[in-house]
Amino acid sequence: MAFTPGKWIHMVGIAGAGMSGIARVLAQQGYKVSGSDLQVNDTTSRLEEIGVEIFKGHSSSNLKEGVDLLVTSSAVPQDNIELRLAREKKIPILKRGQMLAHLANAKKAVAVAGAHGKTTTTSMLYMVLANCGTEPSFIVGGELQGSELNAKLGRGDYFVVEADESDASFLDLRPYIALITNVEDDHLDYYKSVDNIRKAFRQFVEQIRPEGFAMLYGGDAFNRSLVKDLTLNKRLLFYGEDLSNDYYFLNWESIGLGSHFDVYKRELGFLGRFELAVPGKHNALNALAAIASALELGLEMEPIKSALKNFHGARRRFQIQGQKALVTVVDDYAHHPTEIRATIDAARNFHSGRVIVVYQPHRYSRTQLLGRQLGEALINADLAIITEVYSAGEEAIPGISGEVVCQAAQSIGCHSVYIPQREEIIPYLLQICQENDLIITMGAGDIWKLGLQLLEVLPESVLKV
């Protein structure tokens, strides 16, 4: 079909982070948009405010006469009743990644991929480009704190997107800038081997437009290996802490909930001192990727600085949920060993009290593959509480549970407990909480709800230390 505003697009699984962002941009472009999901939430309510029709649950009645195209999330099973009916009616069906690529490829796509830091880096890049006056469009996998938006249609040339490598859908993109944070052995349920993951990322770089470039984290071995690939005729730039990178930072300092650092370009030297309002050296690296990309686009330094100074993160990325009785509750999406370690280290950098982590393992397949590494990544927590696995729709695997992670943590001396029943965690926390504790709910599932529940029942005072 021809993609022209006015056509009717129905989206199955519309409440998801990626799908809801696409729905917003399509509606802003003038398409008629409807969608269904098992759960409705604040995001779908905001879509209704701009004219998107939302159906709770899946039903044949949701697919009205006149729908021109159906877009489906990868989380929706192929036997979904709305998908089946669309096939019967010969309504064209696109996957989420294909629709995202159609939108982004129509402009200069700035695509952020990699195992870690995608949402934060994408959000930073959007804020920087917007503050520099380029009026970019964006779709990101988490809401920007302070705006409650995960997408926006801009009038400018750039379209900043979080590229999803989990199912190789990022290979539908033809990026102007391909930014890769790092490449790790994640999503092996799809790729089957690390070699296949690397092949996909190489293809992603190969698909960069001739006038574009790759911005690559220089501390990643795979990214560095691309330099030796003589058949890859692309402009490759590197960022990181090491002075061998095209862009690097020195003199990083943790200051409160943020940090300061000096940015350099290899052939030019010192470029400026930057301030961040989000914690951790990993976020300084995310910011450096945004800084380097913006400077390569010829944008001015001062608006880049001010954008990052005023960036307060994306939802579920070290998000402070509240404080009560001098106990601070933070939520973070970290669900891979590298992310878990970085988040705990960031907390340690600014917090003088105890750091207590409530970690919810995500997916049985990931827990089976990375259970030991997940447990070992919790080592710097004063206490790690491990819950049962959040299945994300997967079938349970015999012998695989949160206890696997807990045993791995205990084996290296991490003080950890396995509490599979969610309703038992808050009473346990209430017994042990003391002043100046920092409690981090952590994982890609629904563990964030527990932090809010804890704040509701925390007494006005807890044990003093």
Swiss-Prot record:
ATP binds at G114, A115, H116, G117, K118, T119, T120. Pfam families: Mur_ligase (PF01225), Mur_ligase_C (PF02875), Mur_ligase_M (PF08245). One of its GO terms (molecular function) is ATP binding. HAMAP family: MurC. It is found in: Cytoplasm. Disulfide bonds: none annotated. One of its GO terms (cellular component) is cytoplasm. Cell wall formation. GO terms for biological process: cell division; cell wall organization; peptidoglycan biosynthetic process; regulation of cell shape. Belongs to the MurCDEF family. InterPro entries: Mur-like_cat_sf, Mur_ligase_C, Mur_ligase_C_dom_sf, Mur_ligase_cen, Mur_ligase_N, MurCDEF_pg_biosynth, UDP-N-AcMur_Ala_ligase_MurC. Pathway: Cell wall biogenesis; peptidoglycan biosynthesis. Its EC number is 6.3.2.8. It comes from the Bacteria. It catalyses: UDP-N-acetyl-alpha-D-muramate + L-alanine + ATP = UDP-N-acetyl-alpha-D-muramoyl-L-alanine + ADP + phosphate + H(+). NCBIfam families: murC. Keywords: ATP-binding, Cell cycle, Cell division, Cell shape, Cell wall biogenesis/degradation, Cytoplasm, Ligase, Nucleotide-binding, Peptidoglycan synthesis. This is UDP-N-acetylmuramate--L-alanine ligase.
